[in-house]
């Protein structure tokens, strides 16, 4: 799960999925500095990496509104949705074909490190080094959250629908592999995420199953477009290839693409999630949440994208447009992101959000900060609402051709 829809505030009444030892699914070793997460309304501070860290030191990362979330759902409803005796719309042949795709495990031997990683990390210094550490932290957290959700779904659906359950388990394998690879990347900076602590300590956002489908489909597809775009750019501009993890993105992104295809098949099996006016409204809502989250996040990290030779806003708009076009094949309605006004609204959101962050950094009293934030929050909310209310693009269909596994480049 390469990208997260994080604008929805997490709620704590839902406990985390019960996994006895999630760390065993993630290859790696102990490192000099272990990073933990803590909840906070303030933006995440830069993370410093140093070889002088004392063994066993715990380093906290602040959790903000846009931090990748961990998700849980109504597993009993999931079991009913995929009960073949209840749901006659399930295309078992399609799921069998998908299962064979996942069993093939095209990337089984892909994520193998070499000495380039440590050498490249040692060359990264100053602000760019800090930015890369944060990139690895956030990416690892997002992938690990996908691992936890998919692993639990695989466990809970085993009796109801063994085929779908096995696919979820194999997707959790992919996510664990990604998270482990990213966490090993942190070892190049003498850091590591405490994934066991994350499992127990993080708050979980509850989504109903249909919302899980919308959010995770978008997360996987936007992750595909982010990875393949960065890979293509660096292949054409090798002088910006400052860390070897990007060389793995071509194959890596196909995991994201296959995961998205699976969620597309899940939604096709539940036409009630796609064929009414409520589905159109929710589709637009989740598209907007994912796009806005990415845009606001990335605009706070322009140094990272500039460091690899990309214009942040141009990169984001390319990813948003391509993701939207892909999503239009399945969602009944999508946003008109190719309307120039949509980008103008995103840019105005960035201005308001940056001012909100700046207020948080001041030494003003809390009530003064609150007063200063009110007009900015109002402005940000009005821009988000205005973007949502823009005339949508009617799209999607539940009349699909038979599934044919393919690679998209």
Swiss-Prot record:
Compositional bias per record (Polar residues), positions renumbered to this chain: 13-23
- EC number per UniProt: 1.14.13.81
Which cell locations does it reside in? Plastid, Chloroplast inner membrane; Plastid, Chloroplast thylakoid membrane
Transit peptide feature, positions: 1-36
**Positions of the region Disordered?**
1-23, 36-60
Annotated Gene Ontology cellular components are: chloroplast; chloroplast envelope; chloroplast inner membrane; chloroplast thylakoid; chloroplast thylakoid membrane
User: What functional role does this protein have?
Assistant: Catalytic component of the MgProto monomethylester (MgProtoME) cyclase complex that catalyzes the formation of the isocyclic ring in chlorophyll biosynthesis. Mediates the cyclase reaction, which results in the formation of divinylprotochlorophyllide (Pchlide) characteristic of all chlorophylls from magnesium-protoporphyrin IX 13-monomethyl ester (MgPMME).
Name of the protein described by the UniProt record: Magnesium-protoporphyrin IX monomethyl ester [oxidative] cyclase, chloroplastic
Print the organism lineage: Eukaryota, Viridiplantae, Streptophyta, Embryophyta, Tracheophyta
Gene of this entry: CRD1
């Amino acid at each position: 799960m390469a990208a997260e829809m994080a604008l929805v505030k997490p709620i704590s009444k839902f406990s985390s999925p019960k996994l006895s030892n999630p760390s065993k699914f993630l290859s790696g070793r102990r490192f000099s500095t272990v990073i933990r997460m803590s909840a906070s309304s303030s933006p995440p501070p830069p993370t410093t990496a140093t070889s002088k860290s004392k063994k066993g030191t715990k380093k906290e990362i602040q959790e903000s509104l846009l931090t990748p979330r961990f998700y849980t759902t109504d597993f009993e409803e999931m079991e009913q949705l995929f009960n073949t005796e209840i749901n006659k719309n399930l295309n078992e042949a399609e799921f069998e074909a998908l299962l064979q795709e996942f069993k093939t495990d095209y990337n089984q031997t892909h994520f193998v490190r070499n000495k380039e990683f440590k050498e490249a990390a040692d060359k990264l210094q100053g602000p760019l080094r800090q930015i890369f550490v944060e990139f690895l932290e956030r990416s690892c957290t997002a992938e690990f959250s996908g691992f936890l959700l998919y692993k639990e779904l695989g466990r809970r659906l085993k009796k109801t629908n063994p085929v779908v359950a096995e696919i979820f388990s194999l997707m959790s394998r992919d996510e664990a592999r990604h998270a482990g690879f990213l966490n090993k990347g942190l070892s190049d900076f003498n850091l590591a995420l405490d994934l066991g602590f994350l499992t127990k300590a993080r708050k979980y956002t509850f989504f109903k199953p249909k919302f899980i489908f919308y959010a995770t489909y978008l997360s996987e597809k936007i992750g595909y477009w982010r990875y393949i775009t960065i890979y293509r750019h660096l292949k054409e501009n090798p002088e910006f290839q400052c860390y070897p993890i990007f060389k793995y993105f071509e194959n890596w992104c196909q995991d994201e693409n296959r995961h998205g295809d699976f969620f597309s098949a899940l939604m096709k099996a539940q036409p009630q999630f796609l064929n009414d006016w409520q589905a159109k409204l929710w589709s637009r809502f989740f598209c907007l949440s994912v796009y806005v989250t990415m845009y606001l996040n990335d605009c706070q990290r322009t140094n990272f994208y500039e460091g690899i030779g990309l214009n942040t806003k141009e990169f984001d708009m390319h990813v948003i447009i391509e993701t939207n076009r892909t999503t239009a094949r399945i969602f009944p309605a999508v946003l008109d992101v190719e309307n120039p006004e949509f980008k103008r609204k995103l840019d105005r959101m960035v201005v308001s959000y940056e001012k909100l962050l700046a207020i948080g950094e001041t030494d003003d009293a809390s009530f003064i900060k609150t007063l200063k934030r009110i007009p900015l929050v109002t402005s940000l909310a009005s821009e988000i609402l205005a973007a949502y209310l823009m005339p949508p693009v009617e799209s999607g269909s539940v009349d699909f051709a038979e599934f044919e596994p393919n690679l998209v480049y």
